[in-house]
Amino acid sequence: MEIKLDLTCDLKNFINKDKQYTIPIFIPHKGCPNSCIFCNQKKISGQIKNVDLSDVDNIIKTYLSYYKDLSKKIEIAFFGGSFTGIDINLQIDYLKVAKKYIDNGEVNSIRLSTRPDYISEEILVMLKEYGVDTIELGVQSMDDKILSIAKRGHTSQDVIRASKLIKKYNIRLGHQIMIGLPNSTMETEIYTIKECLKLKPAQLRIYPVYVIEDSELYDMYNGREYTPLSIAEAVKRCVAVVKECQSEDVAIIRLGLQSTSEITSSNSNIFGPVCDNFAEYVISAIKIGRASCRERV
């Protein structure tokens, strides 16, 4: 794969200054009011079974038993659905299980992911009470036409409102964006990251769009209504997005989807820029662009 880029940027955004252990707890499709066209959370998380309270407790205990470096911070992370869209009592039950490990000193913090339109002051007060210190918003795009086509069910204004509220409550803000959604272009990707950076997220995840079975996007792909990005184009767009982050104090904590038994380049039923080491391609492209610029100076 040949990628020709002309970029002057470094890799400071990829440096994780606060190295820590993360205990991931996936709650597939819990709390989501609708199905976005790209979504099949059970395949994305590699998990079919729903998670009950005893599962949460067992997952935490299992991960804690693996950790050897006790000097590292430990974080519990609820992923896989819109956490704050779950019934409020179930949210509290999940968080109570996690918080007891904070109270006994075994865990330092809790993070979760959710939709921008499922954030309110009432929710944030509760989350603060139970030790949540990072909230990642599924932004995906700041282009309202793209959000509508993707059937997200929220607008860019919801992202702005939720981001400001989260920062008001001194909770660390994370944004998740997707590269290659239907109707997207290099220009809309740049617009999205610029609009996100105005909201000062502390952390960023960048995901190229994969076409996954049993999603509406899969039907669009089969009907030739959608063409996924090539790896080369996805890398090119991601490098441009990363370049926009260089002057900002934002940590890029993931590039590409986490590989699972379902989400892997060996799965012939996943289409798009599927690559088990996508971040390495992006970082290599940045380094190549930086070196080529220095050679001309």
Question: Where are the model-predicted features located?
Answer:
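N-terminal pre-triad scaffold of radical SAM enzymes
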Residues: 6-45, 57, 62-84, 113-115, ...
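Residue-level detector of conserved catalytic or cofactor/ligand-binding positions
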Residues: 288-297
